[in-house]
């Protein structure tokens, strides 16, 4: 029996998550809630994507429904999770992709509406199980965990690298810089924003801003709390980002050892298919539509004075992330059967 899935927020993450897992046997997508544009816009943007191209299935709107190859998904336009009659649609699992509801208090209404599990496509500010697939998904306990977060795209890129280096060499401390594409938290032209740098036109500048990806690693490796920090630089591109990791490790190492550790990890469980390893001189566009979370740029690995390590990791910050989120959804769905 398939687990019935609803999506709240049908923007970049919501639409791509549906694309990624539409034909998976464990999941049945039954409802979409999106406050902007109605079913017509939802269907159109699901079919036609400026970054990821046309989706193969036929997609159309019919009244308050979206049809995918003739299969209907009901559609609503409510502003809050507790306004959506999830129980009427038989939804077991919600993918919360709006980016607006990120605390247990604002997410609790789902459970009052009969939803069994909620996976948030963003870090949750208070207690929730923070899962990075391939790194700590073994922590999921079906009877205990009902609210989960798939962390952030950059945390999903960084965590596999930290796992390999920390478990193989030991990390004393480190700083990361994510060179990250534009997102819809920015503005096309100058406009008011609480982050004055994000208030500036996205297409004209490199924009330093914050990222919580490095500090979030402490949720997975508590011994690294206060030992990692980072910054983001938003760049005028639409897809494929790069994480620049600098670590001080606990023992002497070499470029060859670092790359060997990362390559070996990419070829076996639990990181196979999640961590990649690349020796060709590729650039960001080559990683568009790559489903992996983190791809090592082996040509760029550096070691200085035996213990300072620099690693570059590419990632499709949209497609790679949603693939991990729906893999988490599948893991959760299997626990409900």
From Swiss-Prot:
Residues flagged as site, Activates thiol group during catalysis: 180
Gene3D superfamilies: Dihydrodipicolinate Reductase, domain 2 (3.30.360.10), NAD(P)-binding Rossmann-like Domain (3.40.50.720)
Gene Ontology MF terms in the entry: glyceraldehyde-3-phosphate dehydrogenase (NAD+) (phosphorylating) activity; NAD binding; NADP binding
Keyword NAD in record: yes
Swiss-Prot/TrEMBL GO biological process terms: gluconeogenesis; glycolytic process
Domain of life: Bacteria
Position of the signal peptide: none
Entry-linked SMART domains: Gp_dh_N
Sequence positions that bind D-glyceraldehyde 3-phosphate: 152-154, 183, 198, 211-212, 234
Known role: Catalyzes the oxidative phosphorylation of glyceraldehyde 3-phosphate (G3P) to 1,3-bisphosphoglycerate (BPG) using the cofactor NAD. The first reaction step involves the formation of a hemiacetal intermediate between G3P and a cysteine residue, and this hemiacetal intermediate is then oxidized to a thioester, with concomitant reduction of NAD to NADH. The reduced NADH is then exchanged with the second NAD, and the thioester is attacked by a nucleophilic inorganic phosphate to produce BPG.
Family listed: Belongs to the glyceraldehyde-3-phosphate dehydrogenase family.
Name of the protein in question: Glyceraldehyde-3-phosphate dehydrogenase 3
Organism: Nostoc sp. (strain PCC 7120 / SAG 25.82 / UTEX 2576)
Organism phylogeny: Bacteria, Bacillati, Cyanobacteriota, Cyanophyceae, Nostocales
